[in-house]
Amino acid sequence: MAYFNQHQSMISKRYLTFFSKSKKKKPFSAGQLIGLILGPLLFLLTLLFFHPQDLPWKGVYVLAITLWIATWWITEAIPIAATSLLPIVLLPLGHILTPEQVSSEYGNDIIFLFLGGFILAIAMERWNLHTRVALTIINLIGASTSKILLGFMVATGFLSMFVSNTAAVMIMIPIGLAIIKEAHDLQEANTNQTSIQKFEKSLVLAIGYAGTIGGLGTLIGTPPLIILKGQYMQHFGHEISFAKWMIVGIPTVIVLLGITWLYLRYVAFRHDLKYLPGGQTLIKQKLDELGKMKYEEKVVQTIFVLASLLWITREFLLKKWEVTSSVADGTIAIFISILLFVIPAKNTEKHRRIIDWEVAKELPWGVLILFGGGLALAKGISESGLAKWLGEQLKSLNGVSPILIVIVITIFVLFLTEVTSNTATATMILPILATLSVAVGVHPLLLMAPAAMAANCAYMLPVGTPPNAIIFGSGKISIKQMASVGFWVNLISAIIIILVVYYVMPIVLGIDINQPLPLK
């Protein structure tokens, strides 16, 4: 266990070092400084010189705001969350929305769904339930190198459906490295060193990639999906329920994990090592060190199961009582969170309850503010007439094959999110695709869903996602290796996403992909 803790500390330091190296000591990097100036400049130039006859002044004003915010999001001229506060200032100044209307978007039900999800995830982490779940899954799947690789992917993917992708990978990487270290120490004379090294690289990448893939399983698994839910409601007044998305998302995760496992094991890092020296023994040892499940773990496990059941059965049960509109997914998330604050802890002097308000320090408030900013901007785009105008301009695409548009959108977003924030990418592109769907005469989810899913999937560069940065920080994989392997995983993801959106999602959600919805 000491080695595990030591390695976890080492990963954390390398993870932080990776990002600290990428930041300049100056207040702004060259790119940030350019973005800082370019954003307001585009705002002014748009107001002064862009005046189409069929676009009202309010539409021009919101377009100018959008260009400013998008520039600062992409270049990260100031923190992304700080940029997301601009609508509170700029939309009322242009008489687009009242201060009350803008501010209310930052308290949208969708934001509270994610807030509740974060609190539940932190409860799992505080009482170490996620580690027990992960080790149990790995132990059950088997002892061969192929099964250990699959076990780590299944465990990481499952965790990242409910806790952040970053937290899932941060937990699993030290365990993986400890197993590799044990294998090196117990290596037999006839064991091929190259095979162990190949397994080592495949395991590190498998953990990182599974953390990213698993986020697609639930609406709270990754920010782009919660943005999809919010933007879809904002533009069209329809809801994507937690349960229905799971029916779409979990099969997608299973297929992606399976194909990625096959690719890493038998193509990218093919080796002849069938069994890893000491691998299964170490997993059992770590499970034994956890001991019996504590009272607090049982409470969190029960709450987790309760939350899942309520999310899954909400629509079915509440329709019978005719109160569907009174209880949303966010309502359930906050109810579950309150239970965690109420139930006392027993086996510790440090924490009196399962969760206390100290947890607020760990919540990613910046992500929640970004969601609110995106929803406020979407409201401004709709209210100003900009959405209608954009739809008219995009009518030239009417007649282009919908499948071709889906392919282009998916691949474009997949590679764009390698160098930009996945959350900012989804926030910027989904309102445009909402309007585009009306222009080309297709259901909005045919365009918006693949973009949101693709925004989550970045496998090539350390800066693409926090999981990528963590596995790069392990020192076991080079950027060149990550890019070459990640390129093919990107393409695999694109193919699966397109097939799921075109053939599975319409059946599950009960939509006609050729039937557009009117904008609100």
From Swiss-Prot:
Annotated localization: Cell membrane
Residues that span the membrane, as ranges: 30-50, 55-75, 77-97, 104-124, 160-180, 207-227, 242-262, 298-318, 323-343, 362-382, 399-419, 428-448, 452-472, 491-511
Record-annotated disulphide pairs: none
Membrane-related topology note: Multi-pass membrane protein
GO molecular function ontology, one term from the record: symporter activity
Main location: membrane
Protein name: Sodium-dependent dicarboxylate transporter SdcS
